[in-house]
Structures are given as C-alpha cells and as structure tokens.
Regions:
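Short beta->alpha linker loops
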Residues: 1, 56-60, 156, 174
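Short acidic loop-to-helix transition motifs that present clustered carboxylates
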Residues: 2-5, 83-84
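Nucleotide phosphate-binding/pyrophosphate-handling subdomain across enzymes
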Residues: 6-19, 23-24, 28, 37, ...
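Acidic, Mg2+-coordinating active-site environments of NTP-dependent enzymes
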Residues: 15, 19-108, 121, 125-143
Length: 190
C-alpha cells in the first residue's frame, strides 16, 4: 500500500500502537515530492493519544512525525541508528545489538543479509517493548522473552532479499533507497 493517511490499514479506528518504518521518496505523484510531505502523509496513521514508534534515521521525516505526535498528544518513541548495530553476518543470519530504554545492549539474531532488515527488526522489537509496557500481563515472563527471540530468528520477509535459488536473490524494492540497500546487501554476499 501507500502507507500512512491513504493506506487501507488506516481504517483501524482504535489501534493500540502506530508504527512508521523508514521514509524515503516513493509514490511521489500521490504522497508528495519531498521527504517532509511524504512524512506528513505517513504520520496520517497517528491517532490521538495512541503511542507511536518510528524510524528516526531520516531527520527531516523524524521532525514531521514527532511534531504530529505532539499535536495529537501521542506518546512518541524514535528508533535511531545509534540504538542498534550489526555485530556479525554469518550463514545468512545477522546478529545485532539493540540498546533502548527497554533493552540495554541485548543481542538479537535474524535471518537475512540486509541492513534494512536490522532496522525493521529493531523497530519491531521496540514496538513489542512498548506493548509490553501497555499490557504487562499479556507480554511478560521468560517464555515471552524466549518467544520474542525465537520469533525474530525465524522471521521471513517474502520478496525482501529472498534467496529464490542458490545465490539468486529477489527483492521487491520499489524506490531508489530500497534498491540501493538491496545492492549493498548483495555486495556483502559476494
């Protein structure tokens, strides 16, 4: 979908959490031709008082999203590049560390070879931590932690850096930024 205000998922009237992934130039004929305009459209999913977690690695987009969250009195948590780092890439798995208000330098493993997969996984983990704070009885205990770690390790993103045959990868990247990240990931494998 288009993401944001115009996305079909925005029909959920009372979400428990809003998540905005990285923003780059895409669908410019509909969303606008600047990062700020696109971020404004993406921020259209934010609902009054509903927590929002977002990728803040593009500063112009982050400012727009944070401003919109403030306008709507929505608690806002930003994922910044300094909060995670890739530790090791081995056998099509990435080990990375994540340091947030909820996780102090925890180690995670995900399948894949692309940096954007680390960003997306870190954002998903941060989102789960926020839900854990909101609903502690539903998301607590050692078994939850084990499930979260094993779920991340078993994650599969169809059409994103997907190996469709030995040493042949497919990625549905549809903008310049995504294609660049895919190219970097392929270089890492060769």
């Amino acid at each position: 979908g288009l993401g944001g205000r115009l996305d079909a998922t925005n029909s959920v009237a009372h979400p428990v959490l809003c998540i905005i992934t990285s923003i780059s130039l895409e669908h410019t004929e509909i969303l606008g031709d600047t990062i700020a305009q696109i971020a404004g459209e993406k921020a259209g999913i934010i609902k009054t008082g509903v927590p929002v977690v977002f990728d803040a690695n593009e500063s112009e987009a982050a400012a727009v999203i944070a401003d919109r969250a403030r306008e709507l009195h929505s608690p806002c948590t930003a994922l910044e590049k300094k909060m995670y780092r890739m530790l090791e890439f081995k056998n099509n798995f990435i080990d990375f560390s994540l340091s947030t208000a909820y996780d102090k330098e925890t180690r995670w493993t995900i399948p894949g070879a692309a940096d954007y997969q680390v960003e997306n996984a870190a954002l998903a983990i941060l989102a789960m931590r926020i839900l854990q704070q909101q609903y502690p009885s539903a998301f607590s205990g050692d078994s939850f932690e084990q499930q979260l770690h094993s779920g991340m390790k078993a994650a599969f993103w169809p059409g994103r850096m997907q190996e469709i045959a030995p040493e042949i990868y497919f990625d549905g990247a549809h903008n310049t930024s995504g294609i660049g990240m895919f190219t970097e990931a392929v270089k890492r494998l060769t």
